[in-house]
Amino acid sequence: MLILNLPSETIGSEMYELLTMANQTTEDVFSLLDNLLKWTKSQIGKLNVVYQDIDVVEVVDGVIDIFNMVAGMKKITIREEKPEKLAVSADIDMLKTVVRNLISNAIKFSNENSEVLVKLEAKDGMAVVSVQDHGCGIDEEGQKKLLHTDTHFSTFGTNNEEGSGLGLLLCQDFVVKNGGKLWFTSKKGEGSIFSFSVPLKK
């Protein structure tokens, strides 16, 4: 929402806060519906993997550009550690969806005035992308439920943003379809690191 780029003094602090909340709600609803549509298509076999040569660094840079304003609303800095290029053969739309969900979640569950670190590297024939936040983290009980289709897991971000858990299931599904895997580590009260891998281009 372009109006949120204006200083709060220009439109008044109360109106600015209302617009910020409306913007966040709209983005959350759109993200949920988008994930739901893709998940449904994937589960009924209507979503095929279209392999093409991709630079993961380019994909991640593009997603970060989109989320910088959202992160700025919570005074969160997104920092990257990356090589110049990381070539893979994968479905670009699926890859973008995975990166978008992981960065969105990191911002959602980060504390204000903190940093989200996005790290890219080549390791054992795989391109590995890790997204680390310094936020609320996930307790052990929640970790057991995460990434399982037979258990419902939802939680709230540091500004009470709702998380359905569907986005991570979709990420896992898309990563596996592209020959990789998704994993995470988390500690309650300290934050989480979500990582995924896809095969490097041969």
Language-model regions: role of each:
Residues Y16, V50-D55, G72, T77-L86:
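Conserved catalytic submotifs in the C-terminal HATPase_c
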Residues A22-V29:
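Short alpha-helical segment of the dimerization/phosphotransfer core of two-component systems
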Residues T40-Y51:
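Helix-loop junction within the histidine kinase core
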Residues V50-D65, K96:
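A conserved beta-strand-to-alpha-helix junction within the catalytic ATP-binding
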